[in-house]
Amino acid sequence: MGQTGKKSEKGPVCWRKRVKSEYMALRQLKKFRRADEVKSMFNTNRQKIMERTEILNQEWKQRRIQPVHIMTTVSSLRGTRECSVTSDLDFPKQVIPLKTLTAVASVPIMYSWSPLQQNFMVEDETVLHNIPYMGDEVLDQDGTFIEELIKNYDGKVHGDRECGFINDEIFVELVNALAQYSDYEDDEDGDDNQDDEQDDTAKDQDDNMEDKETQPLRKFPSDKIFEAISSMFPDKGTSEELKEKYKELTEQQLPGALPPECTPNIDGPNAKSVQREQSLHSFHTLFCRPCFKYDCFLHPFHATPNTYKRKNNEAANDGKPCGPHCYQLLEGAREFAAALTAERIKTPPKRPSGRRRGRLPNNTSRPSTPTVNVSEAKDTDSDREAGTETGGESNDKEEEEKKDETSSSSEANSRCQTPIKMKPNIEPPENVEWSGAEASLFRVLIGTYYDNFCAIARLIGTKTCRQVYEFRVKESSIISPVIAEDVDTPPRKKKRKHRLWAAHCRKIQLKKDGSSNHVYNYQPCDHPRQPCDSSCPCVIAQNFCEKFCQCSSECQNRFPGCRCKAQCNTKQCPCYLAVRECDPDLCLTCGAADHWDSKNVSCKNCSIQRGSKKHLLLAPSDVAGWGIFINDTVQKNEFISEYCGEIISQDEADRRGKVYDKYMCSFLFNLNNDFVVDATRKGNKIRFANHSVNPNCYAKVMMVNGDHRIGIFAKRAIQTGEELFFDYRYSQADALKYVGIEREMEIP
């Protein structure tokens, strides 16, 4: 019977009771601790106020205070009334003239809002933070509104069910408190089995050091604790999830602990030698490619690193030694670099037609490192490769004549940029130590500069190109292979590319004709080395592939930009026709790629991304509440401002819209089928533009560098001082409900 009672004390019911009691004790302790903190802060602030008051009193005693002269009434003035102030004390009676102020009209009601200059993505609010006050009239008309509003949030209201609240701090303290019960029970079990463990005492003494190292692992709380907490708080996850959460929280509390997947600073004293992916993890995680900045508030996702190499000649190796100790003078160095290039471009290295310096004879050349002409190993789109074959023989003769010459230069730095002709160097490799920062930086740069070891050495700054080359040879089996470049098929000509794109655009347009209102949010496709077919998310959403997609630049679904030489403000421009702004990375001839600070841009289809807004003034409107007035003269179809605000989901917009309808004031604006712009809490001044069935402005949703943005444009010529209106697209009933006054028609 005793054993049965002992087992029942350790059962799940007992653990649930312990969780409840410890949780209530922690909540009570936290409440008392919070009260003590508030009391301590109150006393501290009160003491500071008293000290400051005493200082001010001492200053006032030292100052000379001028007496206040009591104004005497002027009885000769008509309409003058007197106001007297008397006191029961011995103070003299004060008589002053009474002036009546004229009535001033009150300003319209305005709810508080935060100014924004760009859109701001926010998460859905699944908990109702506060029950809005609607007034007695609204509640009398619709008494069930508050109940329906709470149902939209699944009955979750901030502050309810306080007893079921558990945050990370309470969770860790609760587990630590329950761990004491588990340790006590383990000690009891250890006493019962003490006789059985005496035979292993000698073995335990031999492994004493190992036991000390593994002691933190054995002190980890029992699974019973997490199972009991999971049963008491099922919304916090399963026992395994709680266990992982406890590990993360306790590791973060350790002194000097780094966040998960965090690499020490490459410039710090604790720099480690890690792989390229680990060094660039923070960059790829925090850097937003569309916004080109860190910690972006607009894009909740971040695209994976682009696997396609840019077609430029920035990292090309010119094939000339950088100094008397350059790695290219080593025996077999050129062949090694050529083999790397040949492996990267997926084409077998070609044997040069003429003889060259440092070339091995045919009978001694190794098949694993065939010789390759440096000009052939460079990028295929280099403009400097055009004349490599024309002067080949003369260059070979000059190299043969100068093969045995030595340089008179005394430059010993291999990072020098002056080309020097030298003999092949067959010195043994240097034994140089590489720090963790240098090794990590090398692995990052090798993915960009490939076999250009001279450029890598200049960027590292502490190693010569020969040392970089030798380190690259040593790391050949460790460094992950570079993704091969597709150069088997030559790139299409621009005319043919635009012709194919025009045919593809007509297909897309035919699909959109049946459902023109379906506009979906763009997300970059991520299926590298795979064509954009019917499984591509861009094709499914009927969106064009953008420059942020992982597909090839020759993708048929990728928007190529325009080649206009005019202002791009007619349907002759492909970008204007597709309701897009010209992309400065794609549209290189229309002026969209001009200097960013330039005010006079020839392209008129890039105003939103450049922020070329007009000067707007806020003042009371004759129609309803506040209105927005323009301080500049605007021509027809000219950009005025962008409609900015919080970007919320359609579900969140439905929940907020029910509250806004009761207030009869809404700033919701549909962006696409996925998101809505809400300028109620955050926005810019254009949010005050009123509705009209005869507006002088119109709104247009445009694709701007992969993002849908709302632009407000002039529907006709607008003069300085006019109030701005655009059509909210209300139904007839809503228009009468929300906008009671229609402005008078103005004759232009």
Curated annotation (Swiss-Prot):
UniProt-recorded Gene Ontology molecular function terms: chromatin binding; histone H3K27 methyltransferase activity; histone H3K27 trimethyltransferase activity; promoter-specific chromatin binding
Basic and acidic residues composition bias: residue spans: 200-220, 376-387
Biased composition (Polar residues): 362-374
Compositionally skewed regions (Basic residues) per UniProt: 347-359
Coiled coil: none
Keywords: Biological rhythms, Chromatin regulator, Methyltransferase, Nucleus, Repressor, S-adenosyl-L-methionine, Transcription, Transcription regulation, Transferase
Extent of Acidic residues compositional bias: 184-199
SMART domains assigned to the protein according to its UniProt record, in alphabetical order: CXC, SANT, SET
GO CC terms: ESC/E(Z) complex; nucleus
Oligomer and partners: Component of the prc2/eed-ezh2 complex.
Protein name, as recorded: Histone-lysine N-methyltransferase EZH2
Native source species: Xenopus laevis (African clawed frog)
